[in-house]
Amino acid sequence: MTSPALKDPAKTRVIVGMSGGVDSSVSALLLIEQGYQVEGLFMKNWEEDDGTEYCTAREDLADAQAVCDRIGIKLHTANFAAEYWDNVFEHFLEEYKAGRTPNPDILCNREIKFKAFLDYALSLGADLIATGHYVRRRDTGALTELLKGLDPNKDQSYFLHAVGGQEIARTLFPVGELEKPEVRAIAEKHGLATAKKKDSTGICFIGERRFSDFLKQYLPAQPGDIETTEGEVIGRHHGLMYHTIGQRQGLGIGGLKDASDEPWYVLHKDLARNVLVVGQGNEHPWLFSRALLASEIFWVNPVDLGSPRQLTAKVRYRQSDQRCTLERTASGYRAVFDEPQRAVTPGQSVVFYDGEVCLGGGVIEAAEPWSPRA
């Protein structure tokens, strides 16, 4: 199968997902310079935008429109709020109810940006879509591989690991070959309104609000005890859903008579007893795992795992590649690491790589401790 990207650019219509940020702005500009027929599309994925603390959807739309006006392309708008609620947000809440720490950006990419947006763009007559993600693609015969972005500080393949090769084949990633300072320099050179705009951080539907304040609107908090690894109760938590493995801030522990001055960290969430288990020190043994279990793994392209395979993995965004052996089990997958892994967190994603190729990944179900626990 010939990849759509191999067509003559002058005869190829590309719709760029315009977020109102500098990366998508420069992506559209670069595609114009490469000779593509370019249009933009701004997605609204969340309805509640009347509060000043919510992420600035109106400002983002205005910035996207200003950029499109500047470079001379049409901007479409689409509302995917219903799809986002059904396919991303409800799953996000269910995971927190189950005491896990989900990553909604990964589902958003799979269900919204590379499904709802892609389908909508194709219905408008597009041949391809494009986004401002820092990743690359490589066409190898009938398959299209997902590669890391060249800028190691901005590589976003971790967040795109659940997007299939067929969708990657329909997508261009113009800034994936660039480093962030180069992208900003291009935007400044061409007078784009987003040239100096700060990168968005956090989960879009939460914006600048405190996470705990947002979450309690949707889920009832269940306070419980905070215990040491020896079972001593040393405080109360407001709800396990507000805490994640390895967390240091916001525990409200201090001034204990027999404790050292070392900071406290979340080591474990005992869901059955609604207890938060904590310990002192950044290097506490309970923070480290030798292996993890993952349920279903989503592969970008088919992967043969008939026997254990040496790969690298990331258990969080921006982590350096960690050597591991991945094997099938009766109930899913098990990754055994060469080195101890800190704060492996159920609900987060583990993503596997073969060199620069992102193979895919899955949700972490459980971690196996590096050393035995009493």
Swiss-Prot record:
GO terms under biological process: tRNA wobble position uridine thiolation
Localization, UniProt: Cytoplasm
UniProt-annotated binding residues for ATP: G17, M18, S19, G20, G21, V22, D23, S24, M43, G132
Site keyed Interaction with tRNA: positions: H133, Q348
Region (Interaction with tRNA): 154-156, 316-317
Highest taxon listed in the record's lineage: Bacteria
Known EC number: 2.8.1.13
Residue pairs linked by disulfide bridges in the UniProt entry: C108-C204
Region (Interaction with target base in tRNA): 103-105
Family matches, as Pfam families: tRNA_Me_trans, tRNA_Me_trans_C, tRNA_Me_trans_M
UniProt KW keywords: ATP-binding, Cytoplasm, Disulfide bond, Nucleotide-binding, RNA-binding, Transferase, tRNA processing, tRNA-binding
InterPro entries, A to Z: MnmA-like (IPR004506), MnmA-like_C (IPR046885), MnmA-like_central (IPR046884), MnmA-like_central_sf (IPR023382), Rossmann-like_a/b/a_fold (IPR014729)
Listed SUPFAM superfamilies: Adenine nucleotide alpha hydrolases-like
Family: Belongs to the MnmA/TRMU family.
Name under which the protein is recorded: tRNA-specific 2-thiouridylase MnmA
Organism: Pseudomonas putida (strain ATCC 47054 / DSM 6125 / CFBP 8728 / NCIMB 11950 / KT2440)
Taxonomy of the source species: Bacteria, Pseudomonadati, Pseudomonadota, Gammaproteobacteria, Pseudomonadales
Gene: mnmA
